[in-house]
């Protein structure tokens, strides 16, 4: 029997985290739960781990470090199996990622370009059988986001403005090349 006490948004977070590695969606669903639960610090720490991994994977090493470091400080005193997961293991892995990012950021941008830190996904180990069952059941009902949002994305209006700007530049370039061709023809002997 599935434990009904597990928040569906928390279960969805675990699906996106472990199955899809979709840290953007992890943030979206867990932020909703975090706000609903009066900004519970443990949920905030889990949210920050997802955001930190999102930044790390997308090359924002400073942002990744800041989020992961904050998450570690927020979660390091939580019970080792809080919320039905191996919290101690997750905190240790997040701490290792934060340490790696801190070293990379301290070395400077030149070194980052030559040898960026190696990214790896984390997996949240589910230790409570009822939670594991709830997550397995949710696998078929939580849709996979394809394509995943792996980088910063702007809305449709931005895309339309960008296309209009590019078209304007092409028109000006074409008009400029016509003018220069006309000038060259007039100057020809």
Predicted regions and their residues:
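Helix-turn-helix repeat elements of alpha-solenoid scaffolds
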Residues: 17-29
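Residue at a conserved register position within TPR or TPR-like alpha-solenoid repeats
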Residues: 16-17, 48, 55, 102
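Alpha-helical solenoid repeat scaffolds, predominantly canonical TPR units
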Residues: 29, 48, 67-74
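TPR-repeat structural position
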Residues: 22-23, 61-62, 68
